[in-house]
Design a protein with these regions (language model features):
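Acidic, glycine/proline-rich low-complexity segments that act as flexible tails and inter-domain linkers
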Residues: 1-39, 45-118, 148-149, 156, ...
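Interfacial loop-to-transmembrane junctions
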Residues: 161-162
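Basic- and aromatic-enriched surface patches that contact anionic nucleotides/nucleic acids
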Residues: 123
């Protein structure tokens, strides 16, 4: 299989993001341990939707189209929305000290988890990616346990975190470059 390696994204990154460029090239130049190419690009697409950076999302989307079906793209969107909801609730619940409130049921609809057009493992991988962004310990642990029970390796789970970390850094670099400001010029003490 010919890997493009998100080259259009790498080309947009500034020189001070060389580590990020190198990591993107390495992550998307070959199949990562425990993840199919489709899953790698699905994770990247879910991350792109979550990060909401149009430049990055367009770069990811252009290459993801080669590896994904429309159902995969929809699953990535579902993952962002559902995980945003559940992570917010579980972060709230874990921060509450009142035991009566903690004991109340969430009663949140989660129909995306039962959608037959979405492969359960892929959807869980996408949800894990978003849980990592949202720093929801409860959701992250829940998705990891579910993925392990489905036969996903710990190396694959670690690779999800690697993809998410690198794409968040890429977004930061792109946003710095889009800030309208004058270049930083150091001046001597006598200026």
């Amino acid at each position: 299989m010919n890997f493009i390696g998100l080259t259009s994204l790498v080309k947009r990154l500034p020189f001070y993001a060389d580590d990020v460029k190198q990591n993107i090239k390495e992550l998307f130049s070959k199949e990562l341990e425990g993840l199919a190419i489709r899953q790698m690009y699905g994770i990247a697409l879910a991350a792109g939707y979550y990060l909401k950076n149009e430049q990055m999302l367009n770069c990811i989307r252009a290459e993801a189209k080669i590896h994904l079906e429309e159902a995969d793209a929809t699953a990535a969107k579902f993952a962002v929305v559902v995980t945003s909801m559940t992570s917010t609730y579980h972060n709230f619940n874990s921060s509450v000290t009142d035991e009566e409130i903690k004991a109340l049921p969430a009663d949140l609809h989660l129909s995306a988890f039962s959608d037959p057009s979405i492969l359960k493992t892929d959807f869980e991988l996408y949800c894990l990616a978003i849980s990592i962004f949202l720093k929801c310990k409860y959701c992250t642990d829940l998705h990891i346990k579910s993925l392990i029970s489905q036969g996903v390796s710990k190396a694959a789970i670690n690779n999800v975190a690697r993809i998410v970390s690198v794409l968040r850094a890429a977004k930061a670099a792109l946003e710095i470059e889009n800030i309208r400001s004058y270049e930083f010029i150091a001046r001597g003490p006598n200026f």
